Curated annotation (Swiss-Prot):
It catalyses: orotidine 5'-phosphate + diphosphate = orotate + 5-phospho-alpha-D-ribose 1-diphosphate. This is Orotate phosphoribosyltransferase. Orotate binds at residues 115, 143. Catalyzes the transfer of a ribosyl phosphate group from 5-phosphoribose 1-diphosphate to orotate, leading to the formation of orotidine monophosphate (OMP). It comes from the Bacteria. Its EC number is 2.4.2.10. CDD domains: PRTases_typeI. It comes from Thermosipho melanesiensis (strain DSM 12029 / CIP 104789 / BI429). One of its GO terms (biological process) is pyrimidine nucleobase biosynthetic process. Coiled coil: none annotated.
Amino acid sequence: MSIEEILEKSGAILEGHFILSSGNHSEKYVQCARLFENPTYGEMVGNMLAKKIKKYNPDLIIGPAMGGIHIAYVTAKYLNKRNIFTERENGKMTLRRGFKIIPGEKVAIIEDVITTGKSVKEVIEIVEKMGGKICCIASIINRADENPFKYPYEYLTKIEIPIYKEDECPLCKKNIPPEKPGSRYLKK
């Protein structure tokens, strides 16, 4: 089964009016958490991503909460590598729970969907500060126009969905109320 078929069967692509984690607006939202409602789909996608990044030979797989936690874990499982995650504390991405990055360790950063790459860039900063060596970045879905990182970037599929600044959003102009599904909007 292809990644596109899995996304469709899992109901991961939502339609409506959404405010993305970046603050931009969109008519569609990819909710990759829906993939993991069915463990078979989650395992399939993690295996696909593991095959994509195996050539980088990472020592550690790290994903930002919330979206990157599941896919980073399943990818690490297939590569038999250590897995940790970052999370927000008072609005700032941090490494907690006793997680460590060993200086010199080759690190793969895994995310579910990348649009602007903002969360991943915050993880990059943490990894670099702790002396990790980033070998690659990977995601299930690429919504970016180009690679927004200075590191190799692998993904399973590219989905082009128009995004709008708030003042240019046609859905706002129609007074359609937006939803905020991204983890950046979870109550702190």
